[in-house]
UniProtKB/Swiss-Prot annotation:
InterPro entries: AlgH-like
Family indicated by similarity: Belongs to the UPF0301 (AlgH) family.
Superkingdom assignment: Bacteria
NCBIfam families in UniProt: PRK00228.1-1
Protein name per its UniProtKB record: UPF0301 protein Bfl251
Taxonomic placement: Bacteria, Pseudomonadati, Pseudomonadota, Gammaproteobacteria, Enterobacterales
Species annotation: Blochmanniella floridana
Cited HAMAP family: UPF0301 (MF_00758)
A GO cellular component entry from the record: cytosol
Length: 193
């Protein structure tokens, strides 16, 4: 991707190239929530926090509801969204209004950072699909564009199925396959002369 081709990547996945060896981002898929002339913000969607679930968060925050539906599973993993503000929650979900701090990312996805959404989890008021993350990934002005030029990432249009339903260990390759790339066939030295 050349510099003059880079446009707004909101509602795209960044798929780490095999050459990216930083343990925070190796084989990661980042969902871009915001991208503008001041930088970019995204959530890693395939790096779960070990032994940490949505249920764990609700218990730790002492959030209970009398409307809790026992048939709704709360054992979903919590993801390490990135190295920034990793003590703060970010919830990607299918559109649903009524929360204190939500932003529409696309017609299929919103992000909410207010605690009131946590009170709906496991109840009939919960958004249809959710992905809970601690922390986020951020890029300053021009930083993401430079990383794309350097082939650190490939950018692909986001897919709600991958975001919410694809098994975690398949997301890296599944996201790349959106544009016909099989990451398992790529060498970690790709792009080096």
């Amino acid at each position: 991707m050349f510099k003059n081709e880079i446009t707004n990547l909101q509602n795209h996945f960044l798929v780490a190239m095999p050459t990216l060896q930083d343990p925070l981002f190796k084989k990661s898929v980042v969902y871009i929530c915001e991208h503008n002339d001041t930088g970019a913000m995204g959530i890693v969607i395939n790096k779960p926090v070990e032994k940490y679930t949505v249920e764990t968060i609700l218990k730790n925050l002492k959030i209970t509801s009398t409307q809790r539906d026992p048939s709704v599973q709360l054992n979903h993993p919590v993801f390490s969204g990135g190295p920034l503000l990793n003590d703060r929650g970010f919830i990607l979900h299918t559109p649903q209004t009524g929360f204190g701090s939500s932003i529409n990312i696309s017609s299929q996805t919103m992000i909410t950072t207010s605690k009131d959404i946590l009170e709906t989890l496991g109840t009939p008021n919960q958004p249809k699909n959710i992905l809970v993350a601690l922390g986020y990934s951020g890029w300053t002005k021009g930083q993401l564009e430079q990383e794309l030029i350097e082939s650190t990432w490939i950018a692909v249009p986001a897919d709600e199925t991958i975001l919410f339903h694809t098994p975690i260990f398949n997301r890296w390759n599944a996201a790349a396959k959106i544009i016909g790339v099989n990451m398992y066939n790529m060498n970690s030295q790709t792009g080096h002369a």
